[in-house]
């Protein structure tokens, strides 16, 4: 009797290549074809951005560490939307003084999709 197991579905194409970049005052780990929420960037929706502050690039050939930045490396991002993060409540109370203060804050965010990571003009991953 033949084995009648269904064929395994192919996983979506993912790559182990990644880059660590500086954006919005923070260091972010980025992979291609994924979206990330960064602090608000001054860019329009559907605009393409190029980040040159690449600190590290890893691909199948090895890891390249910048000092402080990797030479001729860049990450291309597409702005998908401008959003606001979850509301954070700050509540301050002084006991026995009837003093209470309640503040809310929502961080302004930009959702971006990583289109490509390139080193020396060649896309990786």
Swiss-Prot record:
Short name of any one Pfam family annotated for the protein: Ribosomal_L21p
Keyword Ribosomal protein: yes
One Gene Ontology biological process: translation
Single GO cellular component term: cytoplasm
A GO MF label: rRNA binding
PANTHER family: 50S RIBOSOMAL PROTEIN L21, LARGE RIBOSOMAL SUBUNIT PROTEIN BL21M
Family to which this protein belongs: Belongs to the bacterial ribosomal protein bL21 family.
Protein role: This protein binds to 23S rRNA in the presence of protein L20.
Quaternary assembly: Part of the 50S ribosomal subunit. Contacts protein L20.
Protein name (record): Large ribosomal subunit protein bL21
Upper lineage: Bacteria, Bacillati, Cyanobacteriota, Cyanophyceae, Synechococcales
């Amino acid at each position: 009797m033949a084995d009648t197991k269904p064929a395994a579905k192919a996983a979506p194409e993912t790559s182990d290549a990644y880059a660590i970049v500086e954006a919005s005052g923070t260091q972010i780990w980025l992979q291609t074809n994924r979206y990330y929420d960064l602090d608000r960037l001054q860019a329009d929706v559907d605009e393409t951005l190029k980040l040159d502050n690449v600190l590290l690039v890893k691909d199948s050939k090895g890891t390249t560490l910048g000092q402080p930045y990797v030479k001729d490396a860049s990450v291309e991002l597409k702005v998908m939307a401008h959003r606001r993060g979850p509301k954070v409540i700050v509540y301050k109370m002084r006991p026995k003084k009837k003093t209470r203060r309640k503040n809310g804050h929502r961080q302004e965010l930009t959702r971006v999709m990583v289109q490509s990571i390139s080193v020396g003009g060649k896309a990786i991953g």
